[in-house]
Amino acid sequence: MQTLQVDLGERSYPIYIGAGLLDRAECMVPHLAGRQVAVVTNETVAPLYLERLSQTLAGHELTPIVLPDGEAFKHWETLQKIFDGLLEARHDRRTTLIALGGGVVGDMAGFAAACYQRGVDFIQIPTTLLSQVDSSVGGKTGINHPLGKNMIGAFYQPKAVVIDTATLATLPERELSAGLAEVIKYGLICDEPFLGWLETHMAALRALDAAALTEAIARSCAAKARVVGVDERESGVRATLNLGHTFGHAIETHMGYGAWLHGEAVAAGSVMALEMSRRLGWLGEAERDRGIRLLQRAGLPVVPPAQMSADDFLGHMAVDKKVLGGRLRLVLLRRLGEAVVTGDFPHEALQATLDTDYRTLMEQISH
């Protein structure tokens, strides 16, 4: 087992990484506030792992709260089901919520923990690659609104993150690829040598090689922990973690939450960010193409939806958390391994990026 630390003073917490951690009570029990535990999970994950977790926490008063699965259910009505379960089982302020599932479960359980009786403790047990390398670390919680993704939420840190890498054995291939989008992101924004490692090990990662996955998860979590420790509330460098997300959130919102997985939308959005960085003269074609090829090798979509116009993108991007004073800011790349958050770009460069024929571009890159 590896242990990393998110350094936030009195609110610091560990990230445990290893196979079989669902059975390791010592990773969870020290972080429980009291005897009451509510496990928030979904209809897909519950049959796989809920019983094992219940056995690990034997001796505690455990309330399972099983939600419908998917981004389409990341809204107020589903959040209300968590509160219903807590209140019906008479959970008090010394309860601990455990999020057992992917990013949707983690975001909603964390938001419920932030709100319930004005704040109770919670633990993240992420079971998808995307949630293990990204959403479970850093305390971003929330739900979607019909007009924009993750627009309602709170910064609320967990007491621990427990990453059982063995849960990836049950992950569908499409979900694995979606998680790789966020892994690749770390290489693009802050760790260029990691891109080389990913190019070497991509086949092993997609084949669920345990050693390769553990290394990728640890490097990703370490990168995120460093950024969160410096900028918890995204006033500066943390925003670089949103590479591809402004374009990607527009895709998710326009296409209907769940039609594209979050990682798929981030991949297509990252391609657009790479292209815009090239148009601004920061990346050469070879650097842009290197990033795109890696996303392709991960089995990810690299072409935005054909039915989305430039105006569709601009309309959704106006409702983005990085908009300040009415000005759109984007995460772009000065070079591979160095990201910047900027609103200082000519609109023509953005318009040209949105107007690019990405299907033709991919044909050129593949020849």
From Swiss-Prot:
It holds the Pfam family DHQS_C. Its EC number is 4.2.3.4. Pathway: Metabolic intermediate biosynthesis; chorismate biosynthesis; chorismate from D-erythrose 4-phosphate and phosphoenolpyruvate: step 2/7. SUPFAM superfamilies: Dehydroquinate synthase-like (SSF56796). Its cofactor is Co(2+); Zn(2+); NAD(+). Keywords: Amino-acid biosynthesis, Aromatic amino acid biosynthesis, Cobalt, Cytoplasm, Lyase, Metal-binding, NAD, Nucleotide-binding, Zinc. One of its GO terms (molecular function) is metal ion binding. It comes from the Bacteria. NAD(+) binds at residues 69-74, 103-107, 127-128, 140, 149, 167-170. Its main location: cytoplasm. Catalyzes the conversion of 3-deoxy-D-arabino-heptulosonate 7-phosphate (DAHP) to dehydroquinate (DHQ). This is 3-dehydroquinate synthase.
